[in-house]
Amino acid sequence: VKKEDVNFTNLSQKKTSSTRKELVLLIPFNASKTPTDIKKDAFLNISLDYYSGVLMAIDSAKTLGLNIDVKIFDSQESKMSSDVANIVRVNNLKNADAVIGPFYQQYVEQVAEMLNASKVPVISPLSKETGKTFDNLYQTIPPNHVTKDIVFDYMKGNNANIIAVISPKKV
Protein backbone atom coordinates (compact mmCIF):
# COMPACT_ATOMS: atom_id res chain seq x y z
CA VAL A 1 0.00 0.00 0.00
CA LYS A 2 1.39 3.35 -1.01
CA LYS A 3 0.57 6.57 0.79
CA GLU A 4 -1.03 8.04 -2.32
CA ASP A 5 -3.34 5.00 -2.55
CA VAL A 6 -4.82 5.60 0.91
CA ASN A 7 -8.10 7.51 1.06
CA PHE A 8 -9.22 9.40 4.16
CA THR A 9 -12.84 10.36 4.68
CA ASN A 10 -14.32 12.63 7.33
CA LEU A 11 -17.44 10.63 8.11
CA SER A 12 -18.95 13.41 10.24
CA GLN A 13 -19.41 15.44 7.04
CA LYS A 14 -20.70 12.54 4.95
CA LYS A 15 -24.23 12.10 6.28
CA THR A 16 -26.08 10.78 3.23
CA SER A 17 -29.62 10.03 4.36
CA SER A 18 -31.94 9.91 7.29
CA THR A 19 -32.78 6.23 6.80
CA ARG A 20 -32.03 4.01 9.76
CA LYS A 21 -28.78 2.06 9.44
CA GLU A 22 -27.97 -1.26 11.08
CA LEU A 23 -24.47 -1.48 12.51
CA VAL A 24 -23.18 -4.81 13.83
CA LEU A 25 -20.27 -5.08 16.26
CA LEU A 26 -18.37 -8.32 16.83
CA ILE A 27 -16.40 -7.86 20.06
CA PRO A 28 -14.54 -10.67 21.87
CA PHE A 29 -15.94 -10.42 25.39
CA ASN A 30 -15.54 -14.20 25.80
CA ALA A 31 -18.29 -14.10 28.43
CA SER A 32 -18.31 -17.88 28.73
CA LYS A 33 -14.95 -17.83 30.53
CA THR A 34 -14.91 -18.48 34.24
CA PRO A 35 -14.67 -15.45 36.57
CA THR A 36 -11.12 -16.38 37.62
CA ASP A 37 -10.02 -16.45 33.95
CA ILE A 38 -11.62 -13.07 33.33
CA LYS A 39 -9.72 -11.33 36.13
CA LYS A 40 -6.34 -11.99 34.49
CA ASP A 41 -7.41 -11.65 30.85
CA ALA A 42 -5.52 -8.76 29.20
CA PHE A 43 -7.43 -9.35 25.94
CA LEU A 44 -10.71 -8.73 27.79
CA ASN A 45 -9.34 -5.38 29.00
CA ILE A 46 -8.64 -4.43 25.38
CA SER A 47 -12.16 -5.51 24.43
CA LEU A 48 -13.74 -3.50 27.24
CA ASP A 49 -11.68 -0.40 26.41
CA TYR A 50 -12.71 -0.75 22.78
CA TYR A 51 -16.36 -1.20 23.78
CA SER A 52 -16.18 1.95 25.90
CA GLY A 53 -14.90 3.87 22.87
CA VAL A 54 -17.65 2.37 20.72
CA LEU A 55 -20.29 3.60 23.15
CA MET A 56 -18.84 7.13 22.95
CA ALA A 57 -18.79 6.95 19.13
CA ILE A 58 -22.42 5.79 19.05
CA ASP A 59 -23.38 8.69 21.30
CA SER A 60 -21.52 11.13 19.02
CA ALA A 61 -23.20 9.65 15.93
CA LYS A 62 -26.61 10.12 17.48
CA THR A 63 -25.69 13.70 18.42
CA LEU A 64 -24.87 14.29 14.73
CA GLY A 65 -28.37 13.07 13.91
CA LEU A 66 -27.42 9.69 12.48
CA ASN A 67 -30.15 7.09 12.86
CA ILE A 68 -28.43 3.84 13.74
CA ASP A 69 -29.43 0.58 15.33
CA VAL A 70 -26.48 -1.23 16.87
CA LYS A 71 -26.32 -4.96 17.46
CA ILE A 72 -23.45 -6.24 19.57
CA PHE A 73 -22.36 -9.87 19.55
CA ASP A 74 -19.73 -11.66 21.63
CA SER A 75 -17.45 -13.10 18.96
CA GLN A 76 -15.87 -15.54 21.46
CA GLU A 77 -12.45 -15.00 19.86
CA SER A 78 -9.09 -16.43 20.67
CA LYS A 79 -6.14 -17.02 18.37
CA MET A 80 -7.39 -20.56 17.81
CA SER A 81 -11.18 -20.22 17.49
CA SER A 82 -14.17 -17.91 17.24
CA ASP A 83 -17.94 -17.95 16.92
CA VAL A 84 -18.09 -15.46 14.02
CA ALA A 85 -19.24 -17.86 11.30
CA ASN A 86 -22.13 -19.00 13.47
CA ILE A 87 -23.03 -15.40 14.38
CA VAL A 88 -23.09 -14.35 10.71
CA ARG A 89 -25.29 -17.31 9.73
CA VAL A 90 -27.73 -17.34 12.66
CA ASN A 91 -28.26 -13.57 12.76
CA ASN A 92 -28.57 -12.97 9.01
CA LEU A 93 -25.87 -10.28 8.94
CA LYS A 94 -26.06 -10.04 5.15
CA ASN A 95 -28.75 -7.40 5.73
CA ALA A 96 -26.54 -5.19 7.93
CA ASP A 97 -25.29 -1.86 6.63
CA ALA A 98 -21.84 -2.47 8.15
CA VAL A 99 -20.03 -4.91 10.42
CA ILE A 100 -17.20 -3.76 12.67
CA GLY A 101 -14.96 -6.54 13.90
CA PRO A 102 -13.98 -9.10 14.84
CA PHE A 103 -10.56 -8.29 16.30
CA TYR A 104 -8.29 -10.98 14.83
CA GLN A 105 -7.50 -10.53 11.14
CA GLN A 106 -8.20 -14.16 10.23
CA TYR A 107 -11.77 -13.82 11.53
CA VAL A 108 -12.29 -10.41 9.91
CA GLU A 109 -11.36 -12.03 6.62
CA GLN A 110 -13.75 -14.91 7.32
CA VAL A 111 -16.64 -12.49 7.94
CA ALA A 112 -15.69 -10.41 4.87
CA GLU A 113 -15.71 -13.54 2.72
CA MET A 114 -19.11 -14.62 4.08
CA LEU A 115 -20.63 -11.17 3.46
CA ASN A 116 -18.78 -10.29 0.24
CA ALA A 117 -21.62 -11.34 -2.08
CA SER A 118 -24.02 -9.13 -0.08
CA LYS A 119 -21.55 -6.22 -0.32
CA VAL A 120 -21.76 -5.58 3.43
CA PRO A 121 -18.73 -3.49 4.47
CA VAL A 122 -16.63 -5.32 7.06
CA ILE A 123 -14.34 -3.05 9.04
CA SER A 124 -11.22 -4.38 10.74
CA PRO A 125 -10.98 -2.26 13.89
CA LEU A 126 -7.59 -3.16 15.36
CA SER A 127 -5.48 -5.24 13.04
CA LYS A 128 -2.62 -3.80 10.99
CA GLU A 129 -2.21 -7.11 9.20
CA THR A 130 -3.10 -7.52 5.57
CA GLY A 131 -3.92 -10.94 4.24
CA LYS A 132 -6.70 -11.85 1.88
CA THR A 133 -8.33 -8.92 0.15
CA PHE A 134 -12.05 -8.53 -0.40
CA ASP A 135 -13.94 -5.63 -1.98
CA ASN A 136 -15.95 -5.23 1.22
CA LEU A 137 -13.01 -5.35 3.69
CA TYR A 138 -11.71 -2.08 5.15
CA GLN A 139 -8.71 -1.63 7.44
CA THR A 140 -9.02 1.20 9.98
CA ILE A 141 -5.34 1.20 10.87
CA PRO A 142 -3.02 2.06 7.99
CA PRO A 143 0.28 0.22 7.61
CA ASN A 144 3.18 1.70 9.63
CA HIS A 145 5.01 3.00 6.56
CA VAL A 146 1.96 4.98 5.43
CA THR A 147 1.55 6.58 8.87
CA LYS A 148 5.28 7.37 9.01
CA ASP A 149 5.27 8.95 5.54
CA ILE A 150 2.25 11.12 6.31
CA VAL A 151 3.71 12.33 9.62
CA PHE A 152 7.08 13.11 8.02
CA ASP A 153 5.43 14.95 5.11
CA TYR A 154 3.40 17.01 7.57
CA MET A 155 6.49 17.85 9.62
CA LYS A 156 8.51 18.78 6.53
CA GLY A 157 5.67 20.97 5.25
CA ASN A 158 5.46 22.82 8.55
CA ASN A 159 9.22 23.09 9.18
CA ALA A 160 8.77 21.07 12.36
CA ASN A 161 11.61 19.87 14.54
CA ILE A 162 11.81 16.21 15.49
CA ILE A 163 12.53 15.01 19.00
CA ALA A 164 12.68 11.24 19.30
CA VAL A 165 11.93 9.51 22.58
CA ILE A 166 12.80 5.86 22.17
CA SER A 167 12.03 3.02 24.53
CA PRO A 168 14.75 0.36 24.37
CA LYS A 169 12.05 -2.30 24.78
CA LYS A 170 10.32 -1.48 21.49
CA VAL A 171 13.11 -0.57 19.10
Give the positions of each predicted feature:
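Extracytoplasmic/secreted proteins, especially bacterial periplasmic and envelope-associated proteins
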Residues: D49, G53-M56, S82-N86, Q106, ...
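Extracytoplasmic ligand/sensor domains, especially the bilobed periplasmic-binding protein
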Residues: I100-V171
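Signal peptide-proximal N-terminal region
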Residues: L44-V70
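Residue-level signal for short, function-critical loop segments
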Residues: F29-A31, Q76, K169
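Beta-alpha junction/loop-to-helix N-cap segments that form part of ligand/metal-binding clefts
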Residues: L64-T130
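Pro/Ala/Gly-rich low-complexity, hydrophilic intrinsically disordered segments
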Residues: V1-I27, A31
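Short, solvent-exposed loop/turn elements at domain surfaces
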Residues: A31-D37
